[in-house]
Amino acid sequence: MKKRELNFAEIKAIKDGYIPAPYVLEEGEQINDFYLEPVYFENEDGPTIGVTTCGVIVKDGLFFKDMDNSGELAPYKDWRLDHETRAKDMVAHLPLNQQAGLVLNTLWNTPLSMTVDEAKDENGNIVPAKIFKRFVEGEPEPKSILPGVSMRVDDSDILVHKLAAGVYRGDMRASAALSAMYHNLGTQYVEYEACQGGVAIPYSMHTNPINIGYPDFLGVGAAVMGDGNFDLIYNMADTDRKMMKAAGQNIMYGPQVDIATDPRWPRNSGTYGEVPEITSGIIKELVRGYQNGEDGLNEGSVVLTVKHFPGDGPAENGFEPHMPIGQWRLYPTEGSMEKYHLPPFQAAFDMKASSIMPDYSRVATDGRSTPQYYRGKLTSTEEVGSTYSKELITDLARDVMGFDGYVNSDSGITTVQIYGVEDLTVPQRYAKAISAGTDVIGGNSDSENIVKAVEEGYLPKEDLDRANYRRLLSLFKVGRVDNPYLDPDYADKVRKENFEGAKKAAYVANQKAVVLVKNHDNVLPMKKGAKIYIECFKGIDPGAALAQSMGAGVAGGDDNEVLRKQIAALFEAKGYTIVEKAEEAEYAYLHVWPCSNGMVFYQYAMPVIEMVDNQLFEAREANKSQKKTGEMVSITTLKDVDKIKTISEAVHANGGKVVATCVVCNPWLLDKLEPYVDGLTFQYTISPVAMGNALGAQVDVLSGDYNPTGKISLTMVSCMDVIEITEKEIDGVMREVCASPNDVPGYDKDQYIDPAILARAKGGSYAYYDADGNYYRAGFGLSYK
């Protein structure tokens, strides 16, 4: 590698001229052999220019990045012009293969080291292949845990397929500096490859929401409902924004603002709950915090990708649309989309959210649904996945609701979630999605299929130009085009400066997220110094390994003893005595963590929200359809659930009290828990990085060191009658229909349920009714004072 020596004293004297690229490859060398330290040129009243293999144009004493090494100051290189002019002109200069690559994101970008030191050789030089995986000819395709989605991610995505973005899956323990270096390498590769025939576009790292210790999403909803304001949301987002930007994580694949309405849906746990007003308030503060203001993108922004438009909550009886078995959204209730599901998206659009992600699913337009309108407009008539629906992502989102960003599909929509477009070829699917209004498509690197779509006439060139323009415009607005490079040391500094404060705020948020729902005879808080017997109960989580690999796993595994010891240590630190026999205890404390069988990527039965141990349920055609196979499958949502009653009887027989915490990731049926306990709290957190905070916070509440303020964010189901599934003939087809509508939140379901069914429910409601006469409906929660 040849590095040109630059005399910056002489450079400053140049009024008009050209500065060649600071680095030049020599014969036999490849760009991925080196980590190049960027060279910077400071404009006194303009942006800094950062380059590695691009030259710099000097005009009127100002520096401009020569993004194609042509020597011409084209409008897209001229930072004095407005963003729109530059983005439009850049599109005009892109070759077709780079335009195609600009549409795509890879899914599994994972740095190969944890620290900068790990990425060095024995001489202290950075080895790119220790950070960014290098393409190896003939290497077999990694086995995919996501059917139809490639797990292969290496530098060929950039150097061959012309992509300029990927989803960062780095371990949270990886240093911020290492993340920044990964970003810099991606940008370096794009810059070099573009200068051989294209345009240097910044490399973008998307990331799913990364928990830095705050409660999981339902817990956030519970906390703000208790607060009565959304202050903690803005502070969380603003702090996270600073750390993300410094580390090169420029785009958030979130937040998820779906409203939870079907009780069996496994992704209820990823929502902020079921109350549209609460989710709307949360998304407003998230946009303000992450995008650094209320007026759209700016140089301090992280791009938000609000999902899953127009709301995935009304799933068909809990089946999830990552797989064909769950491809339908149902709207049996007139006006439900406008009343419940679209308000959070409207709130996001009003705050100028910069991107949306459509859901995988498609609306059922047969007798299972009623036509849905928004502001007088019929929302959808075509039974295709939302990414393919012009009615939804252009006519509704843009024309009616005022969205003005870019549309980023979820991953796999051209290979797996091809609902309604099964008969189209892959190039035709790309064409339909892009022409419908989708600008970015996730999870693929097959840019050649987009090229083919244009060349074979399926995709009008102007539609591809529009998609590229919208994506590039966001890059110009956040100020990443002229100097996309990052300072790894600064990334570590920013994380260090912000992380301690974030940890403290996150712990307080966990305290606020604890919900006290039962306090019979004021059994709580627990008497200081008392003897406590602890037992942990957990279900079998078939999706834990997959979730863990995606960076969204759950803590604790199946080892209840490890969890018991962790909780015991927290009680002991507050002066309590832990005993080994329930009969010796003044209090039995039960930590109850049910696990859903409703996996996203392996669905073999209807999701179960009862607390069951080795109970048989009807099997379905796994992932393919809801058709019953005639076989039965064993499901355990809570091991040894019957032991709860046994422990309760033993403790009560000796004059003791029973207190429990239920981990709520779905609206569990509590008939095998609540009747046997004197005190009951809810907490909503299962992610590993936040589990310690969640456990500490719940012990703070149980001990009386924190007065609980949290409110239920997800109405708990009263009995199986209110969610009973019956078969009915609809439009000549036998369908399974839920007793309560799939599209209405739990707090509002009673008005739509047959009164005869409600009469069979304890308390006469969809909401769970406890022994003390309280309904576990969204918004309910007790305090000590």
Which residues does each predicted region cover?
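C-terminal non-catalytic regions of proteins with extracellular/luminal or membrane-system context
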Residues: 1-61, 67, 122-148, 152-155, ...
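Active-site-adjacent structural elements in enzyme catalytic domains
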Residues: 6-12, 22-25, 34-36, 58, ...
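Sec-exported extracytoplasmic/periplasmic mature domains
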Residues: 88-99, 104-112, 188-193, 241-250, ...
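Hydrophobic faces of well-ordered beta-strands that scaffold small-molecule active sites
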Residues: 104, 147-149, 168-172, 201-207, ...
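Solvent-exposed loop/turn segments at secondary-structure junctions
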Residues: 106-112, 174-178, 209-213, 251-252, ...
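Glycine-rich tight-turn/loop motif centered on a GG-T
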Residues: 170-174, 217-232, 263-282, 319-339, ...
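Second-shell residues forming the walls of enzyme active-site clefts
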Residues: 188-194, 229, 274-443, 447-452, ...
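Acidic/polar loop patches that form or flank catalytic/metal-binding clefts of enzymes
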Residues: 355-358, 402-409, 440-443, 460-466, ...
